[in-house]
Structure formats: structure tokens, C-alpha cells
Amino acid sequence: MGRRPARCYRQIKNKPYPKSRYCRGVPDPKIRIYDVGMKKKGVDEFPYCVHLVSWEKENVSSEALEAARIACNKYMTKNAGKDAFHLRVRVHPFHVLRINKMLSCAGADRLQTGMRGAFGKPQGTCARVDIGQVLLSVRCKESNAKHAEEALRRAKFKFPGRQKIIHSRKWGFTKFTREEYVKLKAEGRIMSDGVNAQLLGSHGRLAKRAPGKAFLAETIQASA
């Protein structure tokens, strides 16, 4: 028996049903890799970021996520280069889908009970996606922004419903806008933390602070 089409499970109807000690025998999700490309590049390497945002409330199967990841990665590798981007899948398929198998052979009515006890057995997994939730993100240099947009446009065809491609104002995957990041970097108030960045505040033990560095200046505090 083949896999039931994902259009049968597109609408979010019931509560989340994750894998647990009560929900056993769940098949592994098709997507196993969520970060592709130069995932160890520092936060300063890729300042530009493009998002693929869902515009519907729906279920997205793990097969669709894997297909979109492959399509986006293939286009970016071919056109921008394998060292020129970092792709991240932002949703995870934790919701378990069930199927109540029905026999279609001769004499099936003697073997099955119809809709009596129709809870079903685990068939696959999907991600529960809301309106405005980011599905895929690509960080790269500004020169490759057009390639990232086209790669996400191709990945859109793997998903049901509507999606939008949004050019982010943030610096890479951080929470700071590009103007804020450049300003804080020049003031020495930001520290790189892998693909992210940490803002250095004025809290902490005063004994461990260098002379003259115990408190931030009034001008800096006012701007913060």
C-alpha cells in the first residue's frame, strides 16, 4: 500500500500528537539535515538574509521539507558556490500523522470493522506551521541575494498553500538590524557567537570589570 497523499493531512484540526512512550512505532522523518552549506562561518561572513515565510496555517510533511531543502541547496551550490551560503530549515516535523488502513480486496467486509476503533497507526510526521512563520532561511553576502531569492522561489513549489519571500533587515540570523549591528560592533558592545551575536551589557560582578568599565556611559545607556 502506497503512502497516502499529504493533501489529506494539510489542515490543522486536532491537538499536537508528538512521539512519546504512548505513541510508539513512529517512522523516522524524511528530513534529517537542517543546516546546509557553510554552517560554521562566523556571523560577520554572511550579513544578508532571505526568508521563506508561510502565509497559511497548515501541516507541512517531512517529505516536503526535505524536497525543499534539496531544491534550495542544489540551486545555491550551482549558482552561488558551495562556500557562499548557509541554509537553515526553521521548522521541525514533530507532529505524528495516523492512518486507519482499509482493505479493498474481495471479502474485506468480513476482515475489518470499518469506523469502529478508527484511531489509526502512525504513518509519518509533519510540522504544524502558522501564518507568518519562517520555513527556510538563507544567509549569504549581498552579492548573492538574487540567487538566494531564486533558490527559495524554487523551494516554494515543494510546499502546499501560499508562501512569501522576504528580504530581512536583520544581520544574518541575528536579532539586530544591519545598522544596529554595525554601530554596536564599532562601539565594541557586541561579541560573535558562532552564527549569532551576543550583546555585552553592564551587568555582572563589578570586581571582575576593568577599571573605568564598571558602568556604561550615559550616552550609551540612553541609546540602549
From Swiss-Prot:
GO terms for molecular function: structural constituent of ribosome. Disulfide bonds: none annotated. The keyword Nuclease does not apply. It comes from the Eukaryota. GO terms for biological process: translation. GO terms for cellular component: ribonucleoprotein complex; ribosome. InterPro entries: Ribosomal_uL16, Ribosomal_uL16_CS_euk_arc, Ribosomal_uL16_dom, Ribosomal_uL16_euk_arch, Ribosomal_uL16_sf. The keyword Nucleotidyltransferase does not apply. It holds the Pfam family Ribosomal_L16. Keywords: Ribonucleoprotein, Ribosomal protein. Component of the small ribosomal subunit. Mature ribosomes consist of a small (40S) and a large (60S) subunit. The 40S subunit contains about 33 different proteins and 1 molecule of RNA (18S). The 60S subunit contains about 49 different proteins and 3 molecules of RNA (25S, 5.8S and 5S). Belongs to the universal ribosomal protein uL16 family. This is Large ribosomal subunit protein uL16z.
